[in-house]
């Protein structure tokens, strides 16, 4: 029996899929990355927002119509299990999140040996999930209903997993959870992210540590100071702000206002000159007026962010904002999104141009799919999958996980290109 696992949605979902792959492998199952070769297909779904739900349903239907045995798990099932069972009865079984053992039992399998995870990312990086769930009550978000309350993992357990990842050849760990800065508050009764980072920084083989999903109000001084002085934690701040209008932020129940946002960015920049910011905004929230959007647009134009994602609001059942309806037309929401992304495209290019002629450190992820001879990687200011990349011209046979110095020679809107200066040094030194 061959089994294929298809993972949809965010990096946190991907970690769940990798854990499942490890358990299946530990049970002696033959795995395949190609669903067409599989006898059983397990789809790990996302149910966060409308486009993600549609993608999940389309994927389920596609595989269900293929005649293969299909099992569905994840966020979509947590929200809509009864409806799914009724509407797509072709699926053999439905399971919620973290249902790895239940799936093994259903398939009549038992783990013969423990395999923590099977990585589906390049060996250069991996995601490290430090907690599950969320205690926030943002009015637009259904995650607490899907994933439950915040549950931190123990520090020693996380550090052990980081050692496992290092043993696999991983050089960069991307720390993820629904609310990374809340880490430890539930388990240890106080914030413990800095203490966790101290433990992770001691793991041999790990060169970069990247923090993702930082909640604005919990980016405390001790965390900023730690990042400022750390050898491994990158000065990369992924802080989802969602808006900057005081009125909209209040209606979103975010717990801060526009002044707080500006002060936070200013404080980080004051302490970390080369800090890079990524954020996300939501446009088309039910109470967002034209003036609110103009305020957000002006804020984006100020150029605080190297990377920016914009989502159009979609009403989610069971959230505090759901009774507000969806009064802003889809076309208006799309126009607002496109307007912000167009502004940000120019800002990102300008920020990339600041690296022209400079030497940067690049972690190689692999090779460009269309041009298999072109290595590509990322610098400290580029998170995997969501930001741009650096294409590298080199005379060496570069591998995933290599870290090298690259002199930037070209930039585009999102990507950069440069020469492997270490290879040039090797050539010239051999001629002396």
UniProtKB/Swiss-Prot annotation:
Cofactor binding summary note: Binds 2 [4Fe-4S] clusters. One cluster is coordinated with 3 cysteines and an exchangeable S-adenosyl-L-methionine.
Q: Tell me the first and last residues of the signal peptide.
A: none
- The EC number on file is 2.8.4.4
Q: Where is the Radical SAM core domain?
A: 120-350
This molecule's function is given as: Catalyzes the methylthiolation of an aspartic acid residue of ribosomal protein uS12.
- Return the broad EC class: transferase
Q: Which family does it belong to?
A: Belongs to the methylthiotransferase family. RimO subfamily.
GO molecular function list:
4 iron, 4 sulfur cluster binding; aspartic acid methylthiotransferase activity; metal ion binding; protein methylthiotransferase activity
What Gene Ontology terms describe where this protein resides (cellular component)?
A: cytosol
User: What phylogenetic lineage does the species belong to?
Assistant: Bacteria, Pseudomonadati, Aquificota, Aquificia, Aquificales
- Specify which residues bind [4Fe-4S] cluster 2 according to the UniProt entry for this protein: 134, 138, 141
Major subcellular location class: cytoplasm
Q: What gene codes for this chain?
A: rimO
What is the source species? Aquifex aeolicus (strain VF5)
InterPro entries per record: Elp3/MiaA/NifB-like_rSAM (IPR006638), Methylthiotransferase (IPR005839), Methylthiotransferase_CS (IPR020612), Methylthiotransferase_N (IPR013848), Methylthiotransferase_N_sf (IPR038135), NA-bd_OB-fold (IPR012340), Ribosomal_uS12_MeSTrfase_RimO (IPR005840), rSAM (IPR007197)
Database matches in HAMAP family: MTTase_RimO
User: Per its Swiss-Prot or TrEMBL entry, what cofactor is needed?
Assistant: [4Fe-4S] cluster
Which controlled-vocabulary keywords does the entry list? 4Fe-4S, Cytoplasm, Iron, Iron-sulfur, Metal-binding, S-adenosyl-L-methionine, Transferase
List localization entries: Cytoplasm
Q: What is this protein called?
A: Ribosomal protein uS12 methylthiotransferase RimO
- The TRAM domain covers 353-422
Q: Which NCBIfam families match?
A: 30S ribosomal protein S12 methylthiotransferase RimO, MiaB/RimO family radical SAM methylthiotransferase
Superkingdom of the organism of origin: Bacteria
